[in-house]
Amino acid sequence: VAMQQPDAVVIGSDQVADLHGRPLGKPVTHERAVAQLRMMRGQTVVFHTAVAVVCRNSGFEAVDVAQVSVTFRDSDTGMSDADIEAYLQAEKPYDCAGSAKSEALGIALLARLQSDDPTALVGLPLIKTVSLLRAAGVPVLAGATA
C-alpha cells in the first residue's frame, strides 16, 4: 500500500495469542476455536499486537508491540464446554487470534485483563499507534472538535 500511495500514512496491525510459549493464531474453523478456548480455560494468555506506521515520502517506518495479559475464566466460573459452545454459536470469532472478541460477547469468558495499552486486545494498540503517528509528524489532534 505504501508503495502505491507514497503520500499516505499507512498503518498495519496484527495479533497473535501466546499460551505458555505456544502461538495461537486465528482458528478459522469452529472445531479449532473450541480447542483453543478449552486450552485457554483457567489460563493466562499473552496477546501480542504489533502496529507498524509507514510514511514513504518522509522515509518514516516504525513498529511497536503491545502485550495484553488475559486470564480466562475456568469451567466453574463461566467457561464450561456449554459456555464455549454458546459463545461460538453467537459470535463466530473464527478470524480472531485466541477465538474471542473482548469488545463483544467474548468479554464474558475473561476474568482479568492487564496491559499498558488495553485497546491492543481488539487488534490495534491505539496508545502505541498515536505515539508512532506523532513520531511520524502526524498532527493527531489537528482539526479535533468537541
Task: Show which residues each predicted segment covers.
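Anionic-ligand binding patches
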Residues: 1-146
